[in-house]
Amino acid sequence: MNPPESSPLGKASACVDQYDATLLFPIARADQRAELGISGAAPFFGADLWTAFELSWLNQRGKPQVALAHITVPCETPRIVESKSFKLYLNSFSNTRFADAAQVQARIRADVSAAVWRGAASAGSVGVTLLGPDRFAQELMQELDGLSLDRLDVQCTQYQPAPELLSAQHDAAPVSERLTSQLLKSNCPVTGQPDWASVQIAYRGPPIDQEGLLQYLVSFRNHSGFHEQCVERIFMDLWTRCQPIELTVYARYTRRGGLDINPLRTSHPQGLPRNMRTARQ
């Protein structure tokens, strides 16, 4: 068992510049999900989309190479990797020689897969894509699509998750809506540092009260939780209180330490969106 308090997060850490897979610090999802009343298989699908902006290694002649990395971690994995440990792990590539980018990509895939699937009855694999400088121009920027809840002039008084703010018109005809907000903010449960995010909520079902939904999202402002847990809490609260037929919650968190984490949870299996950053990322 690796409690978050034992991770390198919030502590002084030596900068290791020789490849070291043991720097990865897995944290069990089950502990966080138990707080949401989830035991056993989770009632959703999805993944955590990571972007690593600070990845470098040496080629066989000692010349530095750089790349962006997109990592896709299925939400079915029993563990996540604590973000600072992942940064330290990537830093450990910086003075290590590799034959080519494909070898680096394969090493990251193998190491992260082993960390997040640790303890599973059957292990799977994470997705890893490296983009070299010749492809940097293909990395576009796009905001989350949907009707902005932030247009609403609501009074906000609660800054801890308040699911009682959520409601839906269960006697009305089902609708399909895609709603967004730039106002999601929570705090790291270990360091207390702020985590800022844009969030998109797509659903089909009874019309959700938009003012209450915005107030609910704002209520995370002083909440302590990892990115993945916050998105799962939002999903579970909406699923329980508003009872949509279909639901997808997708948040894109601003970058910290050269990494951004973008969890998506959905009630029905679907293709993942392109990992495309927003302006604040």
From Swiss-Prot:
Residues 261-281 are annotated as: Disordered. Its EC number is 1.7.1.13. NADPH binds at residues 83-84, 256-257. It is an enzyme of class 1 (oxidoreductase). One of its GO terms (molecular function) is preQ1 synthase activity. InterPro entries: GTP-CH-I_C/QueF (IPR043133), NADPH_dep_7-cyano-7-deazaG_red (IPR050084), QueF (IPR029500), QueF_N (IPR029139), QueF_type2 (IPR016428). Pathway: tRNA modification; tRNA-queuosine biosynthesis. The keyword Transferase does not apply. It is found in: Cytoplasm. Signal peptide: none annotated. One of its GO terms (cellular component) is cytoplasm. It catalyses: 7-aminomethyl-7-carbaguanine + 2 NADP(+) = 7-cyano-7-deazaguanine + 2 NADPH + 3 H(+). Keywords: Cytoplasm, NADP, Oxidoreductase, Queuosine biosynthesis. The active site is at 188 (thioimide intermediate), 195 (proton donor). Catalyzes the NADPH-dependent reduction of 7-cyano-7-deazaguanine (preQ0) to 7-aminomethyl-7-deazaguanine (preQ1). Homodimer. This is NADPH-dependent 7-cyano-7-deazaguanine reductase.
